Amino acid sequence: MSSNLTSNEMSSTSAIVEPPEAVKGNERDKSTRRSTSQVVRPEKHEVENALEDQCSSSSLPKEAQYYAKLDKKLEGKDPRSQFYEAVRLSADIFAHKFEKAVCSRQTFEPTNSIIKVLNTAEEEMLHEKVVPLPVSSKLQYYLNRGRYDTIFDRDEQLQRTADPMADEPDHVEKRVTSILEQASREMEEGEVEPVFYDGSDEDQELPIDLGAMRNLQRTNKFAARSSRMAARRGGRPGYRGAFRGAARGAPSRRPAPAAEVAPETPVAAPMAPAAPAAPATPEAAPAAEVMDTSIATEMPQESAVDLSNVSAATEMDTSKEGEASRPTSEKKKKIRTTEMDRLMSMDLGPKDGGRVGELGHMWPESRRRPAAPLPETPAAQPRKSLPRRAAEKKKPEDSDAAEEQEVEMEVDNDASTSTPRNARGGRGGGNRRGSRRGQKRTSGGSGKLVEPKKEPVDEPAEKIPKRSEAAPEVPATATTKEAPPSTSSSPPDAPATPATPASSDSRDSPRKIRAMIFSLTGSPPESETPPVLQQEQVISTAAPTAGRHPNIIQQVPHINRIPPQPLRRLTAPQAPPASQPEEPPVQQTVPVVKVELASAPAPIVRDPQSTEPVPPAMPTLVENNHEATLILPPNKTSDYTRWNAQDLINWVRLLITNNVDSTIAIMVREEFDGETLACLVLDDDFRKEVPIPYGHYKKMKIYGTEVLNHYRTEKYQADLRKFHEELAAWKAQQR
């Protein structure tokens, strides 16, 4: 969002809400009558009516339309989607009312519905770690301008302290600020890409502009401090009072004396948003220009909005004298102490991998949940921790081997001056990548440098010989879990016990011993699977280690001896895969069942007609007083239900010879088919609905009655033949 766009938008907005001349005159009268002790404040209903009229004249829809849209969008959605929509629409309403209140110089009071939604959003943010991504671009626009805390005049705030609803807008501002700051922090940690809003679609759901949110805290601080410094210099801390002191070009940063304060400063002067952009004096112009460029370099191009208005405030905030000159009696008032205590007393627990530390701005160190884990016994420890322990024991061995390799590389590099040192493989102070590259550069134990391989796939193949040299006592067959039992009694396995430095510890559990065995043999800890899937392999692995570690004989077979039996009983009736040796006996059970069924006596095959069949009813024929012959369409039977529209037209052409085109046109328009023939014969009111000529209708009804009676007679004869067949079968079944 560029500065030109911002100034145009503000000028258009101010042109819409510019009060009439009568209102301007009243405001001038109010400004003359207003003093520091008495403030003329409009009624709440007057403010809301004025805002409603401004909403109707502005490009944004009314608040009622917003809530109607909210109810429509939240219909049938999950709670998280409802929360996103509520925050987005409430932020739109909040920013819209804020804009109208600032432009019309009126008191801004958000409605209770907006306060309720913002409270809900804050609680959701703190309790459920929800990031409200859809935030209004209008709200970001006013946050970036640095005018967020300059809504109310200082004297009006002092007069409204007795009102219980006086601090409500300030609370809402701080809640919105805290919500957006929390969302910005979580989005920065998640490295979310900032998406900038171009203003084309009003209903577009936007992620938070990270570039704008990084400057949120700084811009709010500018507005607060600029209002205080303007008050010390004699300017009013209103909309333009925050920048009035900088516009005067005062060379000193100290507060002005009381005698120099001008109490007759006009209050209700017409608002000109673009006026503070140009400095009043030539001395202030370079400073403002420099500050504008500094902010433009920090903020993204899309979020650097209205930098000319913020320049004066940033210039005043560069020195710390204003902060140092503030008396110690002015302390920041604590807001929502009861809510803060309630949140501090809650124990939310670590969520999403223990992200409680991100709530450091809410809980002190004394109230946080201790992050130290409880000591786990070996029995309650999950099997997934074995690879972690094995990996931890691998690290010192790998680092020692890497250091030895680096020493050899240094000696070789000093001896051979013709070979240059590779910058990528230099010593990195424990860098494992450099040590692994060093292993690739040396071929065997000769110490000669070779070119490093670019394929990372060959890296595990070169690590295996290095581990085998460090522990030559362990046989290579130990890496495979199907070693024969004869290897357990071989003499080279005996001296393998002193090779492990941690084997002398009497407190080592069988799980620790197995982890050390994995680290010596070189088998990756990730290849270990639960014992239910590898029962036979675990038992075969325990056999060769019987001579070295007697504890494994007591633990591993005892654990893995019982589970295979119920699994085999459950899987025996099922068809196993083709690779299992138990497939032939399972397939033999199928012919046995077939033999038993064949040897059993054949059941009596009964006809589906278990009761005596009923003869068909006599057909109901339509009385025809005229003698007529049966006329059918070409290649069709008397089954008129199977006639299509063309068959019916052909049948009519056989009956009627003169002026048949008019009747056929009516039939095509009304979409006649074979089913229509029954309606024409049986329904006497058919001609009232379809205007067919009477002569044609009479002839079609006579010959149609003949077709209908013939079809019913044939159907009855077919049903009668079927009845006789079923009756004969039933009688044979009863014998």
Swiss-Prot record:
Basic and acidic residues: bias regions: 317-355, 389-398, 450-470
Region annotation (Disordered) ranges: 1-59, 223-288, 300-534
Subcellular location: Nucleus
Major localisation: nucleus
Region annotation (SAM-like) ranges: 621-712
Tissue spec: Widely expressed. Weakly expressed in most somatic cells of 50-cell stage embryos. At 200 cell stage, it is strongly expressed. By comma stage, it is expressed in most somatic cells.
Record's compositionally biased regions (Low complexity): 239-288, 471-504
Lipoprotein found in the keyword field: no
Function, as annotated: Polycomb group (PcG) protein. PcG proteins act by forming multiprotein complexes, which are required to maintain the transcriptionally repressive state of homeotic genes throughout development. PcG proteins are not required to initiate repression, but to maintain it during later stages of development. Also required to repress expression of other genes and for localization of sor-1. Binds RNA.
Domain notes: The RNA-binding region is essential for the localization to subnuclear bodies and its function. The SAM-like domain, although only slightly related to the SAM domain, apparently displays a similar function. It is essential for homodimerization, the interaction with ubc-9, and the formation of subnuclear bodies.
Name of the featured protein: Polycomb protein sop-2
Lineage of source species: Eukaryota, Metazoa, Ecdysozoa, Nematoda, Chromadorea
